[in-house]
């Protein structure tokens, strides 16, 4: 959408230099997009749902707590279907009453229509592919984190501040 004052462009009226869509984006809380579909092959299991804190907290628990306190308004997890039930029980059940939570699934065959999946391909396509899985549920500024990395409170505050300050661009 072009940002030209005083004219109608794209799908929203412009207010000065900001469109209605941009004003809506500025008032939205950012979304936290968590990459949690890892195979855990070196670890030997699903490290993203294994507890390590004094009360069984996962690394994700610390990140989500910090993100909520920083002002994030929704959490979207990208996971694999084969551990959906365990993930819902261990992770989603903790947060779905505190903040909107969405699950999206990474699948090797969910790719842009102009591409063809090689028959021998069994593994997902990586980080960019995982982020593409969120396109139908994320309509606001968002930050992407790994489920098994610790970032700290200050990182989420900086991310949220930045995402709230960004004008919507299409």
Regions of interest found by a model, annotated:
Residues 2-4, 23:
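Acidic, Ala/Val/Gly-enriched low-complexity intrinsically disordered segments
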Residues 20-34, 40, 54-144, 151, ...:
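Conserved N-terminal catalytic core of the sugar/cofactor nucleotidyltransferase
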Residues 45-46:
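Conserved catalytic-core motifs of eukaryotic protein kinase domains, centered on the activation segment
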Residues 154-170:
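Conserved donor-nucleotide/metal-binding helix-loop-beta segment in metal-dependent transferases, i.e.
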């Amino acid at each position: 959408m072009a940002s030209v004052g005083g004219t109608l462009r794209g799908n929203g009226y412009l207010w000065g230099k900001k469109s209605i869509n941009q004003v809506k984006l500025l008032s939205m809380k950012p979304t936290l997009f968590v990459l949690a579909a890892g195979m855990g092959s070196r670890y030997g299991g699903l490290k993203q749902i294994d507890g390590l804190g004094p009360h069984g907290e996962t690394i994700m628990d610390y990140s989500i707590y910090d993100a909520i306190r920083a002002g994030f308004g929704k959490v979207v997890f990208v996971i694999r279907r084969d551990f959906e039930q365990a993930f819902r029980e261990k992770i989603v059940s903790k947060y779905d009453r505190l903040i909107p939570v969405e699950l999206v699934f990474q699948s090797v065959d969910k790719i842009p229509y102009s591409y063809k999946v090689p028959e021998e391909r069994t593994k997902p396509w990586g980080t960019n592919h995982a982020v593409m899985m969120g396109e139908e549920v994320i309509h606001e500024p968002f930050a992407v984190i790994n489920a098994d990395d610790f970032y700290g409170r200050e990182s989420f505050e900086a991310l949220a501040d930045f995402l709230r300050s960004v004008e919507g661009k299409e």
